Design a protein with these regions (language model features):
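Short, compositionally biased P/S/T/A/G/V-rich stretches that sit at domain boundaries
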Residues: 35-59, 152-177, 181, 188, ...
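Enriched for extracellular/lumenal, surface-exposed ectodomains of secreted and cell-surface proteins
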Residues: 86, 127-140, 255-260, 364-367
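Long, low-complexity serine/threonine/glycine- and acidic-rich segments characteristic of extracellular
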Residues: 1-16, 20-28, 33, 85, ...
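Beta-strand-rich ligand- or partner-binding modules
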Residues: 1-79
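Beta-sandwich strand segments
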Residues: 24-30, 134-148, 194-196, 259-268, ...
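Short loop/turn motifs at secondary-structure boundaries
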Residues: 68, 106-107, 162-168, 179-184, ...
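Short solvent-exposed strand-capping/beta-turn motif centered on an Asx-Ser/Thr pair
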Residues: 20, 48, 57, 69-77, ...
Length: 392
């Protein structure tokens, strides 16, 4: 009885028989020798039954999908089955993942199902898979326990697209904006596998008129981050609502990177804008002037909020009001340069065409709002009144 021998300590045994006959001096003639034992189980990888590997070329961030069947072809049960997965790159750097499956019973199969996100991989890769590695449990043979396949991870090289707007408007250097602007930073990426979900990959700073720079991050109370959640629309948004407390020129600097580290441009987005705290209207004119069929009004608003009760009056040179253009008719207005959606066609309040000639116009403002401060030498605008000419 050899059951007392530790099989782990003595994994291999050899039985020798020694006989001795002091009388007849004739060796015993052995008729047979029978050994009773529990045979080790035997598992194999059955590629013919099931084998899945989604592609030999994957986009960075795409999930590697692998599946194969393990089968116990012996009459003895196996304990819980250990599986080892190894990914090796061109530099022989390895990623090893172990998985423990249910016990593999005699003549039964189990599915090895392994998915791995390739976001940290790039270039040529080798994938090794092995059941019962490192002699985890007794087995008759191990040569049929492993397999290997190669694949390639295509690196994301395309940069994300960055878009910045102030109160819904794209501005240029020198534009006037509100003292409490709503700045929307929109980042889009074509990658269908790596979401824009890391706010740390977006750098935002604001330089005030004194040259002081403030950096904003996810912890800043003025900032909110909306991560991308849909791979079909890989878009992240940052809302920034700074309170700009002094007059002067500010500079906003923004740089964004996608999940692969591609930056939105060789140079950061940078725009310089002006804040004027006092509420006023200036640089009022109509265009075209003279006009024959229609004209629009252009003016600059400063301060924090657009006044609710702004309107424009059209008058004859004798001072008679012939047309009132209400706030609602003017259309959407903002702090900064405005060009009204409204196009005046040269008619009065009753829809009648006015005669050719010179007319006056005036912007009506709240009592506490400063009047026009035209910065341009404008021969058509004097003492709060502008001149327009109808010429049909």
């Amino acid at each position: 009885d050899l059951s007392t021998i530790n099989a782990t300590e003595y994994p291999y045994l050899r039985l020798d028989m020694y006989t001795m006959d002091d009388i007849d001096r004739t060796p015993v003639n052995l008729k047979f020798w029978r050994v009773f034992y529990d045979a080790a189980p035997e598992a194999i990888l059955n590629k013919d039954d099931t084998f899945v590997f989604n592609s030999d070329t994957l986009q960075q961030g795409q999930i590697m999908e692998f599946a194969i069947k393990a089968e116990n072809i012996s009459s003895n049960d196996m304990d819980s089955l250990l599986v080892k997965y190894t990914i090796t790159n061109e530099n022989n750097e390895t990623i090893i993942v172990y998985d423990r499956l249910e016990p593999l019973k005699s003549n039964e199969t189990q599915l090895l199902d392994f998915n791995y996100n390739t976001k940290a991989l790039q270039g040529d890769q080798q994938f090794n898979f092995e059941i019962n590695p490192e002699g985890d449990q007794p087995e008759k043979f191990v040569f049929n326990n492993f397999g290997v396949t190669d694949f390639y991870v295509r690196t994301d090289r395309k940069e994300p697209v960055l878009d910045v707007s102030f109160d819904g408007i794209h501005i240029i250097n020198g534009d006037i904006v509100a003292a409490n602007p709503f700045i929307l930073i929109d980042i889009r990426d074509e990658n269908e596998f790596l979401l824009l979900d890391d706010p740390e990959k977006i750098m935002i700073s604001l330089i005030d008129p004194n040259g002081n720079e403030v950096e904003y991050n996810i912890a800043s109370p003025e900032l909110s981050f909306e991560a991308a959640t849909d791979l079909n629309n890989n878009q992240a948004k940052i809302s920034l609502e700074p309170l700009l407390s002094q007059d002067g020129d500010y500079t906003l600097v923004v740089q964004a990177a996608d999940a692969s580290g591609n930056i939105s441009g060789d140079n950061a987005y940078e725009v310089t804008f002006r804040v004027i705290l006092r509420e006023s209207v200036s640089n009022v004119l109509n265009y075209p002037n003279p006009f024959s069929s229609q004209t629009q009004f252009i003016f600059t608003l400063t301060g924090s909020e657009v006044p609710d009760d702004i309107s424009i009056s059209i008058l004859t040179v004798s001072g008679k009001v012939v047309k009132e253009i209400s706030r609602e008719e003017l259309g959407p207005l903002r702090i900064g340069l405005n060009r009204t959606d409204y196009k005046w066609n040269g008619t009065d309040d009753f829809g009648e065409k006015l005669a050719n000639g010179v007319y006056l116009y005036k912007v009506n403002l709240p009592a506490d709002m400063e009047r026009y401060e035209n910065q341009y030498a404008d021969r058509f605008f004097t003492k709060g009144f502008g001149k327009l000419v109808i010429m049909r």
